[in-house]
A protein has these predicted regions:
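N-terminal active-site segment of His-dependent metallophosphoesterases
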Residues: 1-50, 56-60
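Active-site neighborhood of divalent metal-dependent phosphoester bond hydrolases
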Residues: 40, 47-100
Length: 100
């Protein structure tokens, strides 16, 4: 059984597209995205939409990483301090992209 595992796309859509191209050429039996698909980069929403399509169409499996947990937390909890507010600038942007 061939298993492809990738992680740390960090919301860079061209990187995810390149990964998909390589994986598709390899023809694995199973594909696992091992976290950190979103956050930090410019296109969390685009990466999530593309991966979700692969999940639905091809059965790719997601595993949440710390960035997914952090983005989800931003959707439900206000920053605890001014320092956390500054840290969350990009994460809040990622939340806005994926919440739509």
């Amino acid at each position: 059984m061939k298993v492809a595992v990738f992680s740390d796309v960090q919301a860079v859509l061209p990187a995810l597209e390149a990964v998909i191209e390589h994986i598709e050429a390899w023809h694995p039996d199973m594909v696992v995205m091992a976290g950190d698909l979103v956050n930090r980069g410019p296109d969390s929403g685009g990466c999530l939409a593309l991966f979700d399509g692969m999940r639905r169409e091809r059965g790719w499996l997601p595993v949440y990483g710390n960035h997914e947990v952090w983005v989800l937390r931003c959707g439900v909890q206000a920053p605890a301090s001014e320092g956390e507010r500054e840290m969350r600038r990009f994460t809040d942007l990622a939340w806005q992209q994926v919440a739509d």
